[in-house]
């Protein structure tokens, strides 16, 4: 039987198509998070913001990989720490999103009694952190409400920033959600990511940020003291079926905000928040 090169043509086409398809698949974005299994990610970069706060960038396996974290959810960090009987696990919300490929960023403030925060602060570039997720009841979807009111304190800004960025990114696809954010801190230098927040507010008229300080500098025009029911009434949307209040901050602040929002007519915040709650506490 004579050999015909044309007879191999269909197989060549199939092979090329298969290889091409594999290349497209292999070069695409892959979600790396596993909800029930810790994985190790290498610290790639550390950006110090203050004496006790930094942004930690962790490397994903490939430059095209994404974390795979729904907007509004968080991850768990785990570490075996001397003196602790079992692995210590704490939750953090990245300030990056799946728009950022090849890495994820965590804003972490170290506390004297914070086991995980101190552990991360002592990590050197090249060392690894155990991570799993996603976790959490909050998942943002475009136009899920007409208006968000947000109340945050300190590093409680992280889930708020994640949601705000997603809303503003979605403007071109029809996301019309309004956002008013009350961000409370002790001193001016404690206002984390202020430049980012101000830039977002300048860019988008439907996002407004209201700063509150315990120790304001001379000439300060923002709020002063603790966040009160009067501040919430003045700055945030009134109770309505298409309004949701998000709260994240130190436990005493969260407890106070639950009482304040209830006094203003919002639905009573539950001990453990669910997505459908009018007042959702991270």
From Swiss-Prot:
Q: Name one GO cellular component term.
A: mitochondrial outer membrane
Q: Which reaction does it catalyse?
A: 2 Fe(III)-[cytochrome b5] + NADH = 2 Fe(II)-[cytochrome b5] + NAD(+) + H(+); 2 Fe(3+)-[Dph3] + NADH = 2 Fe(2+)-[Dph3] + NAD(+) + H(+)
Example GO molecular function term? cytochrome-b5 reductase activity, acting on NAD(P)H
Which cofactors must be present for this protein to function? FAD
Q: Which InterPro entries match?
A: CBR-like (IPR001834), Cbr1-like_FAD-bd_dom (IPR008333), FAD-bd_FR_type (IPR017927), Flavoprot_Pyr_Nucl_cyt_Rdtase (IPR001709), FNR_nucleotide-bd (IPR039261), OxRdtase_FAD/NAD-bd (IPR001433), Riboflavin_synthase-like_b-brl (IPR017938)
What are the UniProt keywords, alphabetically? FAD, Flavoprotein, Membrane, Mitochondrion, Mitochondrion outer membrane, NAD, Oxidoreductase, Transferase, Transmembrane, Transmembrane helix
The FAD-binding FR-type domain, residue ranges: 36-141
> Binding positions for FAD?
121-136, 147-181
Which residue windows are transmembrane per the record? 2-22
Membrane topology annotation = Single-pass membrane protein
- Protein location: Mitochondrion outer membrane
Main location per the UniProt record = mitochondrion
Q: In which pathway does it act?
A: Protein modification; peptidyl-diphthamide biosynthesis
Q: What is its EC number?
A: 1.6.2.2
GO annotation, biological process:
protein histidyl modification to diphthamide; tRNA wobble base 5-methoxycarbonylmethyl-2-thiouridinylation
State its role: NADH-dependent reductase for DPH3 and cytochrome b5. Required for the first step of diphthamide biosynthesis, a post-translational modification of histidine which occurs in elongation factor 2. DPH1 and DPH2 transfer a 3-amino-3-carboxypropyl (ACP) group from S-adenosyl-L-methionine (SAM) to a histidine residue, the reaction is assisted by a reduction system comprising DPH3 and a NADH-dependent reductase, predominantly CBR1. By reducing DPH3, also involved in the formation of the tRNA wobble base modification mcm5s 2U (5-methoxycarbonylmethyl-2-thiouridine), mediated by the elongator complex.
Complex and partners: Monomer. Component of the 2-(3-amino-3-carboxypropyl)histidine synthase complex composed of DPH1, DPH2, DPH3 and a NADH-dependent reductase, predominantly CBR1.
The text of the family note is: Belongs to the flavoprotein pyridine nucleotide cytochrome reductase family.
Q: Per its record, how is this protein called by name?
A: NADH-cytochrome b5 reductase 1
Its gene name is CBR1
